[in-house]
């Protein structure tokens, strides 16, 4: 199954869960998880968990236009650093929602999806820059979309985890 190119690019680029322990009225405390930290750059992305142990260190992701608009060309530029080589067998767990309705929940071969952004496995350790232009169809139904992508190596080590929330078309 092929994913939409913009979603694939966002997945690969492509988590800081902030916790606090407020005092409780009942005399005990509970951890509160705040929204994820934003990914640097002009984009709607957030990390979905603490990224310090991730294989992909994302330096920046820039989208133009941001937010993406139906019927336009989406320009993507991302820069980062891979701390390990990514080989065949890597995968992405993807969920796309339209409002509260889940449109897609799938586990896909990351290497097969990388061809949509002109990359291929293996991805070598070191700095990476991705630039891509994607024509977005004008027929994208109006509404709010959410994308969650959790990306792993073939050995189940986390590459990255990203959320794009409340994308309005």
Curated annotation (Swiss-Prot):
Q: Which cellular component terms (GO) are annotated to the entry?
A: extracellular region; fungal-type vacuole lumen
Q: Which residues form the propeptide?
A: 20-35
Q: Which GO terms describe its biological process?
A: intracellular sterol transport; sterol transport
What GO MF terms are annotated? phosphatidylcholine binding; phosphatidylinositol binding; phosphatidylserine binding; sterol binding
- SUPFAM superfamilies registered for this protein in UniProt: E set domains
Q: Which Gene3D superfamilies match?
A: 2.60.40.770
| Source domain of life | Eukaryota
Q: Which keywords accompany this UniProt record?
A: Lipid transport, Secreted, Signal, Transport
- Give the signal sequence positions: 1-19
User: Which compartments is it annotated to reside in?
Assistant: Secreted
Entry's family note: Belongs to the NPC2 family.
Q: How does it assemble?
A: Monomer.
Q: What does this protein do?
A: Catalyzes the intermembrane transfer of phosphatidylglycerol and phosphatidylinositol.
Instruction: Identify this protein by name.
Output: Phosphatidylglycerol/phosphatidylinositol transfer protein
